[in-house]
């Protein structure tokens, strides 16, 4: 038996979750947009996924959390739907093309054929742009990263022949969603004095990249049993690394060692970034770097308790449950009303 508590996080990476009022507000929105029928099962699915918001952004107020909840709604609904294989490759590509167009141009790709998810994504884009106000460079940075992420979904889901950790991590640099989540943290504070050019600083890029690796590592362990259950585990290193290093136990040791190394690098890069930063921007940069640490620590806390990953066959003790009230996410995702 294994435990997710084997992942060690510094104390300042962990905060109690924020108030969950935003989740119920956003659930009403997705029902109004007809993404879900309003019932107990869809609420449980929605809460079980979008509760990640209050863990990833624990210091944010209600208005900030609304933006973050809408962002994670788009991510989870789109990713779950495409991962579920309820669409064929052509339909998947078409949906991604339409969503990219909405984020890029702020309107619908085909005004004669508009799905509910397209309507919601446009609503999310418009409300987020309004929230950011004049800091359009923050908004544009977010658009770049979410478009990159959307375009990474299908290639990763269909990369069923991954057989080495380097190739996997190259995919996960974008597909983990950490760059997008961090850019969301940046636009949640539109009054920040941080220079958007921080994103082209190679040390900050490595800082964010390692954050992506850490989140992917945590998610791989948390979602392992769920992915086996749905035959989506071929791209999970807990599976494919067994062909190289032997037992699950050996693979888990490799992953924990990798996790410790990248977390140490994150801390060291943050120290140097703050040291080199102009004094007038230092507090804002510190807010941004701590935001990423809270995203990673929050993802860990959420993974320990969320119903999304519960499976009696999980190798991790925190996720084992026979609770009949726990609804596997794939029992709901096929009810998403994308058409």
UniProtKB/Swiss-Prot annotation:
Native organism: Dictyostelium discoideum (Social amoeba)
Functional summary from the UniProt entry: Terpene synthase that converts its substrate farnesyl diphosphate (FPP) into the sesquiterpene beta-barbatene as a major product as well as (E)-beta-farnesene as a minor product. Is also able to convert geranyl diphosphate (GPP) into a mixture of monoterpenes including (Z)-beta-ocimene, linalool, beta-myrcene, limonene and alpha-terpineol.
UniProt keywords, alphabetically: Lyase, Metal-binding
Induction cue: Expression is almost undetectable in vegetatively growing cells and increases during development induced by starvation. Expression is highest during he ultimate stage of mature fruiting body (approximately 24 hours after induction).
Metal-binding found in the keyword field: yes
Leading EC class: lyase
Protein family (similarity comment): Belongs to the terpene synthase family.
InterPro entries: Isoprenoid_synthase_dom_sf, Terpene_cyclase-like_2
Any single GO BP term: sesquiterpene biosynthetic process
Reaction catalyzed: (2E,6E)-farnesyl diphosphate = (-)-beta-barbatene + diphosphate; (2E,6E)-farnesyl diphosphate = (E)-beta-farnesene + diphosphate; (2E)-geranyl diphosphate = (Z)-beta-ocimene + diphosphate; (2E)-geranyl diphosphate + H2O = linalool + diphosphate
Chain positions of motif NDxxSxxxD/E motif: 219-227
The organism's taxonomic lineage, starting at the top: Eukaryota, Amoebozoa, Evosea, Eumycetozoa, Dictyostelia
Pfam family, one: Terpene_syn_C_2
UniProt entry tagged with the keyword ATP-binding: no
Name listed for the protein in its UniProt record: Terpene synthase 9
EC number in record: 4.2.3.-, 4.2.3.15, 4.2.3.47
Molecular-function GO terms, alphabetical: (+)-beta-barbatene synthase activity; metal ion binding; terpene synthase activity
SUPFAM superfamilies reported in the protein's UniProt record: Terpenoid synthases
Segments carrying motif DDxx(x)D/E motif: 79-84
Domain writeup: Contains several highly conserved motifs that are important for catalytic activity including the aspartate-rich 'DDxx(x)D/E' motif and the 'NDxxSxxxD/E' motif, both of which are involved in complexing metal ions to coordinate the binding of the isoprenyl diphosphate substrate in the active site.
